[in-house]
């Protein structure tokens, strides 16, 4: 018979000696449960049918959740400590090894802040929603709690539950409020993501029950189990498929252009700003941290897949005449740098991968919000039908220009710093042979060159292309309103701030990244050989040298 325990008392001294700092206040549990409870209250809010009261309520809940995460960072998080902080643990179903365990470290805290920040702005972006507003904002708030849980939980079964929790809101947001092909896009999304998540469940059960005795799925316990290399390789392959769908990795990416092609602006912001980052985070947390022996052999494959992402998606973006799909493929290209950074054995490269996730979350959210704002005015997404609207929408053109420059990694913007860190970190990573490093950085540079070409040509076609007489006479072509300027302004502040002073962000996860890389380098030095199963070509094999430290 299953047992239910109310609490499992902490031993602070034992926790600290194990690299865990208990929470003095349940900040993370509050940040997860507050938006979920708020979403359950939405149906009971009196409403006239226009959704005004619901909008303000949802904004208040989302903003409060953001302030809770900020308070957690300021009051309970120490960036200089590499272990788990803000830790909370409650025994739930001990016979199944299921524990309510949450906490934060350098891998998760920045993404928790990003999630609550982007969600708050997405709620503000959803202000024009008048069709079933209660259901819409209920799903938005439920998704907020689920996404924070993905980054905060410290139990692999809880991670799986949180991973699944955010799938249903996205499916409904696509299927109900999407475009003409919304049913197809939503069905494809749920089939890809729910189907691939089966690998997470299988890996969690295998890792938790391995070794016999009472199962335990807590990250700290799993990381110390010392799985065999063959077992790690099997789990790594399954998790790579599951997380590769969400990142996404080519060829597991085809759901993303369809989803973005049919989504509304607020859903765009959540997809690009948060959902894709879940895949990158999970690769770091599980594949690189818990399965270091397998990671040492799979890392070159991640690097190659990253280059494929960068070049393939950039070239495909050229061919897109649909504005949403063009930006969607641009997102896939930029996430390729995350794969290269995770596959590197240098603290600088891996830190660049983390910064690239944060940077792309901000930049991707801004671009997709502008796509939605532009569509509300032009009622078309086809670049061939746009053009000649720059004079009528000068502020909108300025916002598009700044955000596009951020996306193409202009110096002074966050994207430049993150991509430079990945390039430099991999180029100086002596864990790989010189030939391999030159080839990878050279191919990745091709993607960097392609990005400004398709982004700047896109701007020209939207605002300064051949004038569409019917579109130019459209009375809906009003310039950006204050709400839209405010949303983009809120996103540009951290984009420019990080670009000018990257340590604003990198200091928050520096020690955690260094600890992760040290663990992977130790595993590489132990088991990597020029004839490793996945890399029989000696030019691709790790050179067994010490990776450089993050300066």
UniProtKB/Swiss-Prot annotation:
Enzyme class, UniProt record, top EC level: translocase
Gene, per the UniProt record: ndhD
Source species taxonomy: Bacteria, Bacillati, Cyanobacteriota, Cyanophyceae, Synechococcales
Membrane topology qualifier: Multi-pass membrane protein
GO molecular function list: NADH dehydrogenase (ubiquinone) activity; ubiquinone binding
Gene Ontology terms: cellular component: plasma membrane-derived thylakoid membrane
Pfam families the UniProt entry points to: Proton_antipo_M
Function: NDH-1 shuttles electrons from NAD(P)H, via FMN and iron-sulfur (Fe-S) centers, to quinones in the respiratory chain. The immediate electron acceptor for the enzyme in this species is believed to be plastoquinone. Couples the redox reaction to proton translocation (for every two electrons transferred, four hydrogen ions are translocated across the cytoplasmic membrane), and thus conserves the redox energy in a proton gradient.
Keyword annotations from UniProtKB, A to Z: Membrane, NAD, NADP, Plastoquinone, Quinone, Thylakoid, Translocase, Transmembrane, Transmembrane helix
Catalytic reactions on record: a plastoquinone + NADH + (n+1) H(+)(in) = a plastoquinol + NAD(+) + n H(+)(out); a plastoquinone + NADPH + (n+1) H(+)(in) = a plastoquinol + NADP(+) + n H(+)(out)
Record family assignment: Belongs to the complex I subunit 4 family.
Record-annotated membrane-spanning stretches: 25-45, 56-76, 111-131, 133-153, 157-177, 189-209, 233-253, 264-284, 298-318, 335-355, 356-376, 397-417, 438-458, 485-505
GO terms (BP aspect): ATP synthesis coupled electron transport; electron transport coupled proton transport
Protein EC: 7.1.1.-
Official protein name in the record: NAD(P)H-quinone oxidoreductase chain 4
Keyword Lyase part of the UniProt annotation: no
Compartment(s) of residence: Cellular thylakoid membrane
Primary location: membrane
């Amino acid at each position: 018979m299953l047992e239910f325990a109310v609490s499992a008392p902490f031993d602070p001294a034992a926790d600290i000696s194990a690299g865990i700092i208990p929470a003095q206040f349940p900040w993370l549990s509050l940040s997860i449960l507050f938006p979920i409870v708020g979403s359950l209250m939405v149906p009971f809010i009196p409403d006239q049918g226009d959704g005004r009261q619901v909008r303000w309520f949802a904004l208040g809940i989302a903003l409060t959740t953001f302030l809770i995460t900020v308070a957690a960072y300021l009051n309970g998080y120490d960036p200089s400590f590499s272990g788990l902080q803000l830790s909370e643990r409650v025994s739930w179903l001990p016979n199944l090894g299921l524990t309510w365990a949450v906490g934060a470290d350098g891998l998760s805290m920045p993404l928790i802040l990003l999630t609550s920040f982007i969600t708050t702005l997405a709620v503000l972006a959803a202000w024009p929603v008048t069709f079933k507003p209660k259901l819409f904002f209920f799903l938005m708030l439920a998704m907020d709690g689920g996404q924070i849980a993905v980054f905060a939980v410290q139990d692999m079964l809880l991670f799986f539950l949180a991973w699944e929790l955010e799938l249903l809101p996205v499916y409904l947001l696509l299927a109900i409020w999407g475009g003409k092909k919304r049913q197809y896009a939503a069905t494809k999304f749920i089939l890809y993501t729910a189907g691939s998540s089966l690998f997470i469940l299988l890996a969690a059960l295998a890792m938790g029950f391995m070794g016999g005795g009472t199962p335990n799925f807590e990250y700290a316990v799993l990381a110390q189990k010392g799985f065999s290399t063959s077992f790690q390789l099997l789990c790594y392959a399954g998790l790579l498929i599951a997380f590769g769908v969400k990142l996404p990795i080519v060829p597991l990416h085809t759901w993303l252009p369809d989803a973005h092609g049919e989504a509304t602006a607020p859903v765009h912001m959540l997809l690009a700003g948060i959902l894709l980052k879940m895949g990158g985070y999970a690769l770091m947390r599980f594949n690189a941290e818990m399965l270091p022996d397998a990671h040492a052999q799979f890392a070159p494959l991640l690097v190659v897949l990253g280059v494929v992402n960068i070049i393939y998606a950039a070239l495909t973006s050229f061919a897109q005449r649909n504005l949403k799909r063009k930006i969607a493929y641009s997102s896939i290209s930029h996430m390729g740098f995350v794969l290269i950074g995770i596959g590197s054995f240098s603290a600088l490269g891996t830190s660049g991968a983390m910064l690239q996730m944060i940077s792309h979350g901000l930049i991707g959210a801004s671009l997709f919000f502008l796509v939605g704002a532009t569509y509300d005015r032009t009622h078309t997404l086809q670049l061939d039908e746009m053009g000649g609207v720059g004079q009528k929408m000068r502020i909108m053109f300025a916002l598009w220009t700044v955000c596009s420059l951020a996306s193409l990694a202009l110096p002074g913007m966050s994207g430049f710093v993150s991509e430079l860190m990945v390039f430099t970190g991999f180029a100086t990573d002596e864990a790989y042979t010189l030939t391999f490093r030159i080839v990878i950085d050279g191919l990745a540079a091709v993607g960097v060159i392609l990005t400004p070409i398709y982004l700047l040509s896109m701007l020209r076609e939207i605002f300064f292309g051949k004038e569409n007489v019917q579109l130019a006479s459209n009375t809906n072509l009003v310039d950006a309103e204050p709400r839209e300027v405010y949303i983009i302004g809120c996103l540009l502040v951290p984009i420019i701030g990080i670009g000018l002073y990257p340590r604003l962000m990198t200091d928050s996860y520096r020690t955690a990244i260094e600890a992760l890389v040290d663990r992977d380098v130790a595993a590489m030095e132990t088991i990597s050989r020029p004839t490793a199963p996945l890399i029989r070509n000696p030019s691709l094999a790790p050179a067994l040298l010490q990776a450089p430290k993050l300066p």
